[in-house]
Amino acid sequence: MSAGSRVDAPGLWIVLMRCHHALSKIAEGSIEDSGLGLTDFVALEALLHKGSQTITEIQSRVLLASGSMTAAVDRLEEKGLIRRTSAPGDRRVKVLKLTRAGRRVVETAYGRHAAELESAMSVLNPTEKQQLRAILKKLGLFAAGVGAKEAGDGHG
């Protein structure tokens, strides 16, 4: 494609979806290889990198439905990978914490996951990775704003 070629939005959407599909297969495969489901992994990863949190805090970070998150927390607690404790000052609020076993499992799984993604993205140099991140973030924020506006207008 020449520098002057026009790239239309539907064509770009197809490229984005194909890329997303290919990278998702790699990411999900690396997670499954660790014996975790995707929901369990993202909950453990959030606790690993952000520390103890409530279910609601994790949900908002990883964009999971309430039912999925509750089921994941129950599974992870049964496996001894996390524990629930009461929040200081409000015993009704439950805070999730990694156990030692949970930390070992998620550190190993995350290491494998990160290595697989690094390998998949090794075709990009550091500058291209920074540019891609900035462009995708810009597009995502704009699209989220457009979607919110359309939902408010009753047209979407």
Locations of the language-model features?
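C-terminal regulatory/oligomerization modules of transcriptional regulators
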Residues: 1-6, 126-156
